[in-house]
C-alpha cells in the first residue's frame, strides 16, 4: 500500500501536479455588544480584534476573550474612534498582551480615544497608523486594509473608518466600519475586488439611499448587522439587502454570531 501511495505521488509530480495544502480555518466571532462593534478574527494561531465596543463593553469583551482562551492579541484594529468602536479599547490593552494597535490617521478627540492611546503608551504597544493600503497575514488569511484617502467634510470620523477586505481560500469578506454615504459612493474606487461572499453592513444598518447600488455591487450571499433590540437596524436596509439577493442576514441583537470559513464555504452559528 505504501509503495502504491508513493507511486501515485511520484506520478503527480512527474505530471506537474502538486498536492494543494488546505488553508487553516478562519473564524470570526461577532460579539453581542448591542449597537456597537467588536469582532475577533482567528486563523493559523494568529488573531485580530476589530474594535472593542463602548467603554462599558470593554469588560464584557475582555471576559469573552478570556473564556475563549485568548491570552494575547496580535492586532487590535480600531476602525475609527467613535465611542461604540473604540470605547473598550483601553480595557483590552490593559488586560491583554496586545502586540500592535492599528488605527486610522484621523482620530476624533474624545475621552475614549485619549484613554486608548494612553493605555497603548503605558503598555508599550506598537501603534501603526494606516495611511495607505496595508496588507497583513493571519495564518492563511490575507487582510487588505484601506484607509480613507481624504478627511470628509461630513461625518469625518465614520467616513474615516478603516475598510478591510479579507481573503481566505476562495472566500472573500468585506468589513466596512461605519462608512456613510460619502465614503460609500467612493468605496468601489478604493477596493481591489468587486464581488464578495460576505459583508459586514455599514453603520449598524443605518439606511442610506445609495445602499441598494452598493449592496448590488458587493454581491454578497451573507451579511451581519451589528444592532440591538433598543436600537435596531432600519427595515429599509434589510429590504435593500434582500433585493440585492443576500440570502443570510444575521443580526447581533439575536446573540453572538460565529462565522467559519474552510476556504470554500462559509458557515454561521448564533447563540
Description of each model-found segment:
Residues 2-3, 13-271:
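Non-globular, low-confidence helical/coil segments that flank catalytic cores
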Amino acid at each position: 500500500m505504501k509503495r502504491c501511495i508513493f507511486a501515485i505521488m511520484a506520478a503527480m509530480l512527474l505530471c506537474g501536479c502538486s498536492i494543494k495544502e488546505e488553508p487553516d480555518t478562519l473564524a470570526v466571532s461577532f460579539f453581542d455588544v448591542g449597537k456597537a462593534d467588536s469582532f475577533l478574527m482567528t486563523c493559523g494561531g494568529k488573531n485580530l480584534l476589530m474594535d472593542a465596543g463602548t467603554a462599558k463593553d470593554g469588560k464584557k469583551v475582555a471576559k469573552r476573550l478570556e473564556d475563549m482562551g485568548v491570552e494575547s492579541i496580535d492586532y487590535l484594529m480600531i476602525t475609527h474612534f467613535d465611542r461604540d468602536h473604540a470605547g473598550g479599547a483601553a480595557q483590552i490593552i490593559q488586560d491583554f498582551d496586545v502586540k500592535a494597535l492599528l488605527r486610522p490617521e484621523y482620530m476624533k478627540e474624545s475621552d475614549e480615544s485619549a484613554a486608548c492611546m494612553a493605555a497603548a503608551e503605558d503598555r508599550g504597544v506598537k501603534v501603526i497608523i494606516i495611511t495607505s493600503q496595508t496588507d497583513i497575514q493571519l495564518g492563511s488569511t490575507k487582510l487588505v486594509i484601506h484607509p480613507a484617502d481624504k478627511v470628509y467634510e461630513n461625518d469625518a470620523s465614520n467616513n474615516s473608518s478603516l475598510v478591510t477586505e479579507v481573503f481566505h481560500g476562495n472566500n472573500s469578506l468585506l468589513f466596512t466600519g461605519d462608512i456613510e454615504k460619502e465614503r460609500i459612493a467612493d468605496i468601489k474606487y478604493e477596493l481591489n475586488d468587486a464581488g464578495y461572499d460576505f459583508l459586514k453592513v455599514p453603520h449598524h444598518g443605518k439606511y442610506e439611499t445609495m445602499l441598494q447600488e452598493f449592496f448590488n455591487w458587493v454581491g454578497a450571499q451573507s451579511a451581519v448587522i451589528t444592532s440591538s433590540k433598543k436600537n435596531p437596524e432600519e427595515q429599509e436596509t434589510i429590504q435593500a439587502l434582500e433585493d440585492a439577493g443576500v440570502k443570510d442576514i444575521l443580526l447581533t441583537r439575536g446573540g453572538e454570531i460565529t462565522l467559519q470559513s474552510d476556504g470554500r464555504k462559509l458557515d454561521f452559528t448564533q447563540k
